């Protein structure tokens, strides 16, 4: 008996162009025979469902009650046993690498000489359609005994071999379609992402939030401190900006009477790229009338915990080999409290001395803006000394007014706002606050932002006169929060790079 293993052969250093040329020749032959890419095959079963339902059946049970199946999938393995029989493995979209695959068995007696000869010429990566009955092999593997075999789609490019896969990380990002075919972990990551976003939507709807869509093109970039992408609207002959945040439009809806709204969509910020930053990213922002930042913290915690459970199966995660428990109540610290905890060398007097903090920041290579007050300086020192150490979920609260132009000021402590940011594994995940609904105060803060921009702060906000007009009609007391979906998904899926949770991350152009 002779065997031929295409999977092993694929690992040989064969010239890829030669393989492609051979496959194109096969496709040309198919065209001459008739329809090369048929669209009349309708699969009725999925590999994962068959494995779940019949995987525990014995050989005798399957023989006593034959199960007929019709299935399509990509051929990932092929093993020929002489000229009269062959095994192959098909992979479909029904599960991960294990339960999304099923073995097929093709014999000369059952499928005929033509089908047997055709299978010999089929290549790994081809999409096949099969019909037949289930049985168990001697090694107890659930297998389809094929009675009909069809080529649905001819693959022209060879798949990477199973032992090395896509070795280059950039190629994985650039050719995500190949990565998804070959990599079980990649498929699992993006299924978890979908499950988490679906969980968030269900959670919001259960709590009477209405999902809305607000503009992607803005006439004034607003809602966050960030540098926008600019574009030009030809018909209106005006400069426009890809949105950096939907916040001001969502709060206009609260003014209009929609007390609970949320949006899951893309934001764009023309800033740096890193393992935690992508210029195009997904946010979930929500606003609830008659709530405050304390209510928001409890609610945000519940949203994230449920998303982790629905996507991962448990609220106890592992990130980078270290446990992260989202089931426990999240911690809460002030900015100064966090510095005291993680950098206890600083005294109370030093943390309230603006000139001392400026000198310390200089040691970290940070040059604050000339107009920065004590609160902004404390925040900058927190970012250098404490932020990276916030492993467990922690709300940092009571941000200074000067860095929170849209947040409501505290009624009890001068100079701070009812604002929080949520951190875990050393990175920001969410930002929320009791919204500023005093139109005159908001106008004054916008003016301060304009002054900061004139002084050289590129991330300072613009003055939005229409938003002020909306507030002048009256916005009820409101709490609002934004959750970074991509960063949250990095944590839920234990992914070290934000590109790992983006199907098609931004990359430089190919040469």
Curated annotation (Swiss-Prot):
The note on cofactor binding and number reads: Binds 3 Mg(2+) ions per subunit.
Q: Name one GO cellular component term.
A: cytosol
Q: Where found?
A: Cytoplasm
The EC number on file is 6.1.1.6
The yes or no answer to whether the keyword RNA-binding is present is no
Signal sequence coordinates: none
HAMAP family associated with the record: Lys_tRNA_synth_class2
Instruction: Tell me what this protein is called.
Output: Lysine--tRNA ligase
Q: Which organism is it from?
A: Herminiimonas arsenicoxydans
Query: According to the entry, what is the taxonomic lineage of the organism?
Result: Bacteria, Pseudomonadati, Pseudomonadota, Betaproteobacteria, Burkholderiales
